[in-house]
């Protein structure tokens, strides 16, 4: 955070998009609107800026949404009027909300400008459950879990596919392959599974921004290069939908912080 503050002071503030976030619960207890507003103020103070572009209410579970909408949002909209942030956002908690239940409620309310959600090659259900509403209402989307441990940890993809095949959720022949997604690594396709994962998420209709984080600076340039590449071949996208479009809750665990992730 101190590095971010110094960085912001060295450039024109309107040349970058800055976001921050606050959780709405502490354990089983919901936070008050005053507490969340105080968190916003503290973030502004630490960053040395008088506003952020996006303020997110973070990891909101379905059972917290009504509290957020009725108690916290009105207070935050007053802070927005004061110029403390430009756009109001909300993020889901994928490990505990694989069906995007919270966001399906949020997409019915007019207060949200941006949402953050999970979407990846083996977790495609946002295509039906979230993106139609965000596209219709022009709500911005930030994609997380595009890579995470599922695609970045050696052997993890193969392990999960074997488990899913054993449960009857995937064909057994897929579990027998050394690289189950080898069809993506072809001429005109991707050079790596991580590259394919970023390109897949980036070019999904309804995606606006793909997030990535890493503990290794060497990952940054390849990640950006992957995101900037063209879509995967149409046949590959169709095959991913045929093989994995029915899956839910796969690859939504927290990552190894040293790994390449999003």
What is the meaning of each model-derived region?
Residues 8, 109-110, 129-262:
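Structured C-terminal cap/extension of enzyme domains
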Residues 18-20, 90, 143, 212:
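Structural beta-sheet core signal
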Residues 1-2:
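Short, small-residue-biased leader/transition segments that mark boundaries at the very start
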Residues 5-6, 41, 104, 199:
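Active-site phosphate/pyrophosphate- and oxyanion-stabilizing loops and adjacent acidic/basic residues
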Residues 24, 28-129, 139-142:
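Glycine/proline-rich, positively charged
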Residues 5-20, 73-83:
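Alpha-helix-loop-beta-strand connector modules within alpha/beta enzyme cores
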């Amino acid at each position: 955070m101190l590095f971010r503050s110094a960085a912001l002071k060295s450039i024109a503030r309107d040349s970058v998009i800055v976001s921050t976030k606050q959780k709405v619960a502490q354990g089983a207890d919901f936070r008050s609107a005053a507490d969340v507003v105080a968190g916003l103020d503290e973030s502004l103070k630490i960053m040395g800026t008088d506003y952020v572009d996006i303020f997110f209410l973070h990891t909101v579970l379905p059972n917290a949404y009504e509290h957020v909408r009725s108690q916290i949002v009105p207070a935050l909209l007053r802070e927005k009027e004061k110029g403390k942030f430009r756009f109001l956002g909300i993020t889901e908690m994928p490990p505990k909300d694989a069906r995007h239940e919270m966001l399906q409620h949020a997409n019915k309310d007019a207060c949200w400008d941006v949402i953050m959600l999970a979407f990846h090659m083996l977790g495609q259900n946002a295509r039906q459950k979230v993106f139609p509403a965000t596209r219709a209402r022009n709500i911005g989307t930030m994609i997380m879990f595009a890579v995470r441990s599922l695609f970045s940890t050696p052997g993890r993809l193969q392990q999960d596919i074997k488990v899913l095949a054993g449960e009857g959720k995937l064909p057994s022949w897929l579990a027998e392959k050394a690289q189950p997604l080898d069809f993506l690594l072809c001429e005109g396709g991707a050079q790596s599974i991580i590259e394919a994962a970023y390109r897949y998420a980036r070019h999904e209709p309804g995606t606006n921004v793909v997030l990535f984080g890493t503990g290794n600076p060497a990952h940054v340039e390849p990640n950006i290069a992957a995101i900037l590449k063209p879509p995967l071949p149409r046949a590959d996208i169709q095959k991913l939908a045929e093989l994995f479009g029915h899956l839910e809750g796969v690859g939504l665990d927290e990552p190894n912080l040293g790994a390449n992730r999003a």
